[in-house]
Amino acid sequence: MAQGLHEVEDVTSICSSLVLNLGTLEEKTIPAMEAAGRKAAVLGLPVILDPVGATASRFRRQTAIDMIRKAAPSVIRGNEAEIRALNQELRGHEAGNTCGVDSGTFGTIESRLETACSLRDLTGAVVVMTGEEDVVAGKERRFIVRNGHPWMARITGSGCMLDGLMGAFCGLYGELGPDGPLEEAVVMALSAHGLCGELAAGETAGRGGGTGQVHSACI
């Protein structure tokens, strides 16, 4: 959770991975993210980038693109609209602004995998596109993860929970070196997160609760 420019390198140096989440993006935090990314690169740590709201403003899209170029993320994790926007921008096409930052699923599984693979080829990162069914474009393999519950899409912050899990799983696999199977760590993080959602939804429904209780149960 470090955001100060003068501490991010120290904090990054005692971590096993780095998560760059653009959720509360401000101009003053960008240099800190860049510094953390540089330190992670020196240390060989996996870097997970979540381009939150990349479809909401030009500022967010450009910051995400800059992070891709400067921090060289190992994993890029976003919803379908965010991943499509980054893919378009990196291919030289302007992606327009759309309302909101929450997840939506619009294309077929094949079209979503195609977009994820396209961004993977452009960036060298493992690309994760979350939605009703999560798709992963690994270095050599593609995955579809079907764990989860519809209520999870209604919980603000569920994506941030996933980012944390992904950082933990990738940090563990990062100990195997730069050629460690990060895509497997990513898939396991997605599955674990989805299973937590399924269990939390079942527990909450049994008590007659709603999405507010699901959030607490997931934690």
Regions found by a protein language model. Give the residues of each.
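Short, small-residue-enriched loops and turns at beta-alpha junctions
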Residues: 25-28, 53-57, 135, 152
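Charged C-terminal helix
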Residues: 195-219
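Conserved N-terminal subdomain of the carbohydrate kinase-like
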Residues: 1-49
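Structural motif
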Residues: 16-19, 45-48, 74-76, 125-128, ...
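Short pre-catalytic strand/loop immediately N-terminal to key active-site residues, enriched for Gly-Thr
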Residues: 145-157
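Conserved phosphate/ATP/ADP-binding segment of small-molecule kinases
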Residues: 61-142
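Glycine/small-residue-rich loop that forms an oxyanion/phosphate-binding "nest" at active or ligand-binding sites
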Residues: 29-78
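Short, small-residue alpha-helix embedded
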Residues: 85, 156-192
